[in-house]
Amino acid sequence: MALKLGVIGTGAIGQDHIRRCSKTLVGSQVVAVTDINLEQAANVVRDLGIGAEVYADGHALIAAPDVEAVLVCSWGPSHEEYVLAAIAAGKPVFCEKPLAVTAEGCRHIVEAEIASGRRLVQVGFMRPYDQGYRALKSVIDSGQIGEPLMLHCAHRNPRVGENYKTDMAITDTLIHELNVLRWLLNDDYVSVQVVFPRKSGKALAHMKDPQIVMLETARGTRIDVEVFVNCQYGYDIQCEVVGESGIARLPEPSQVQLRREAKLSNAILMDWKDRFIAAYDVELQDFIDGVKAGTIYGPSAWDGYAAAVAADACVLAQNNGAVVPITLAMRPAFYA
């Protein structure tokens, strides 16, 4: 029997998730949608031909008797409110990042979920579902390269919009690395420093770009992440793990290698959605299957909280240039 989903937010990512849950994935049916722009929500329902009911707001959708699970894809500052409402209603909820816009908000969600007595929350960090990252983690976990000593990473975007600010390099961009590298190493961060190289002439006047984020983990692994959101040439994600006895690199996306006019070339993707489209499918299928089986295994509210704590420290490090401690409480047994 199909899991009946309600989707809050019909912007770009909400529409993508409605489409994949209705047309691509198995075992789900979108029966309810809402958006701050109700006309847009109605248009999405009509254009996709899904026959879902449009609700006045997120709380009405969560309370609807036929909604069995909720997808929160709305504006970031609204996430905490809707996730807490879903937990209070006892309904599983998939929340796009951020889980909340503050670490304190994430902690409220963690506390509410623990009080509920069962896992209800999955956070929309899709990189742990990417085939390349999974292969890289398999190599690390197997011990083939020994203990990881250093990671060299990069997160590059061709360009960003006028509303993009320097701190968004952490809260919107690096946040994915903060999640996936912690998962990759099965280790928590203990400190961070951010430095700014020479500013790119392609960067917006009001922001600093690129920047280098240097993290240390509890087991002593050192990580450097280059964040360069105006690189021009493409969307490029890199991750190299230097171990005691070998090096492992994140594989490039599968592309045709072209030999032509005395040149050997490979295309580079320009859109992040193309780079991780398969991972989005896998993560939502995992949520659907987990809810139906009674156990959610995807990125947890605690993972969302850990990323938020690290992000807060990174933003502080942006501003003061110092090595900033990252202090995370002990993981509750609930999330073991």
From Swiss-Prot:
Gene for this chain: iolG
InterPro entries per UniProt: Gfo-Idh-MocA_inositol_DH (IPR050424), Gfo/Idh/MocA-like_OxRdtase_C (IPR004104), Gfo/Idh/MocA-like_OxRdtase_N (IPR000683), MI/DCI_dehydrogenase (IPR023794), NAD(P)-bd_dom_sf (IPR036291)
Keyword Repressor in record: no
Function recorded in the entry: Involved in the oxidation of myo-inositol (MI) to 2-keto-myo-inositol (2KMI or 2-inosose).
Gene Ontology terms for molecular function: inositol 2-dehydrogenase (NAD+) activity; nucleotide binding
Protein known as: Inositol 2-dehydrogenase
Family as reported in the entry's similarity comment: Belongs to the Gfo/Idh/MocA family.
SUPFAM superfamilies xrefs: Glyceraldehyde-3-phosphate dehydrogenase-like, C-terminal domain, NAD(P)-binding Rossmann-fold domains
Keyword Oxidoreductase on entry: yes
Catalytic reaction(s) noted: myo-inositol + NAD(+) = scyllo-inosose + NADH + H(+)
EC nos: 1.1.1.18
Subunit structure: Homotetramer.
GO BP of this protein: inositol catabolic process
Keyword set, alphabetical order: NAD, Oxidoreductase
Enzyme class label: oxidoreductase
